[in-house]
Amino acid sequence: MAEKEVPLTAVKVEALVVMKIIKHGSQAFPTTATGSIVGMDVDGTLEITNSFPFPVVEVPAESHFDNTAPNPAAAAPRAKANAAYEAEMVRMMREVNVDANNVGWYTSANMGNFINMNVIENQFFYQKEMNERTVALVHDVSRSAQGSLSLRAFRLSPKFMAAFKENKFTSEELQKSNLRYQDILVELPVEIHNSHLITSFIHQLQTPTQATPSDLPPSLAALESSQYAKSSVLAPNFDNLSLSIDPFLEKNCDLLLDSIEVHHTETNNFQYYQRSLAREQAKITAWQNKRKTENASRAALKQPLLPEDEWQRLFKLPQEPSRLDSMLNSRQVEQYARQVDSFVSATTGKMFAVKGNLLPGETAK
């Protein structure tokens, strides 16, 4: 194992592990799939060489339609039963001479909605109990289905680890520690690694070549009607002018609006707390002023003074709600916004190109 003083800079994942994670996530979709990853830390690079899924807990059929039902798969990495199962699997791997150092866990996601309390608690459990240098691999099944593999590695920042350990997420504590929602997760670059045998085999594969015509066409008409002329790379591709919006983009926009509504609700709750606190503080101030006036009168009459700290028993200040949920939701809004930004570039250009035809009275400039 590498020295702890060397910070983690990258994550190298074997291609076989990536395929196992993709298969597990696709089979469990749309529910969450979780599992453990093993490997070793080499000079600041976390090499992940194997993985195995956590046991599946059967869920009653009626709970699939209950939004408030708990998700046992999402909480599986920190379950006591799975911790014993993970230790037994690691022991068996060591018996067959496989890299069996626990380096983290993986989870599947849908539309990038992986920033939630389950992921935070799981990663906190691994970094605190298992190994401080563990990571969480997040595989987005929906994004990967679009043709581009989405596999990212995250760790909790030391600043957030300290705040989560003490469970101090009040406004005062956040201002003191300067903790922002951008500081919750630290992303590490992911590199997919193949063995030398697989790399050599891929380089030996021959690219199929198209057959060339053996005889020249007898006329220009025959040349224009041949399959080689029709398949020319210079032929215009009108599919690029399609104005259909990607369903993935539409769903991301819906999720973004939902997260913004949740953020608005959290803001209203905090403002209600501030108004309640201001009312109670005004009552306390009025009571203290009245008590001081009474004590001044009693002092003039040489009577015993009344206690001025009695307000602590008479009044109860409202407790400030935790800002953790608001921070996680803000980080999720940022995640959705980045995904939307990556998908709108092509569609936005097309919409501006036909703006003059879509809106009457305007001409495209």
UniProtKB/Swiss-Prot annotation:
* InterPro entries to which the protein is assigned, alphabetical: eIF3h (IPR027524), eIF3h_C (IPR045810), JAMM/MPN+_dom (IPR000555), JAMM_MPN+_peptidase_M67A (IPR050242), MPN (IPR037518)
Q: Which UniProt keywords apply?
A: Cytoplasm, Initiation factor, Protein biosynthesis
Q: Does the keyword 4Fe-4S apply?
A: no
Question: In which compartments does the protein localize?
Answer: Cytoplasm
Enumerate the Gene Ontology biological process terms.
formation of cytoplasmic translation initiation complex
Q: Name the Pfam families on file.
A: eIF3h_C, JAB
Gene Ontology MF: a single term: metallopeptidase activity
- According to the entry, every stretch annotated as the MPN domain falls at 11-160
Q: Which GO terms describe its cellular component?
A: eukaryotic 43S preinitiation complex; eukaryotic 48S preinitiation complex; eukaryotic translation initiation factor 3 complex
Is Hydrolase found in the keyword set?
no
Task: Note the superkingdom of the native organism.
Answer: Eukaryota
Primary localization class, coarse: cytoplasm
Its quaternary structure?
A: Component of the eukaryotic translation initiation factor 3 (eIF-3) complex.
* Family classification: Belongs to the eIF-3 subunit H family.
Tell me the function of this protein: Component of the eukaryotic translation initiation factor 3 (eIF-3) complex, which is involved in protein synthesis of a specialized repertoire of mRNAs and, together with other initiation factors, stimulates binding of mRNA and methionyl-tRNAi to the 40S ribosome. The eIF-3 complex specifically targets and initiates translation of a subset of mRNAs involved in cell proliferation.
Report the HAMAP family cross-referenced here: eIF3h (MF_03007)
Record-given protein name: Eukaryotic translation initiation factor 3 subunit H
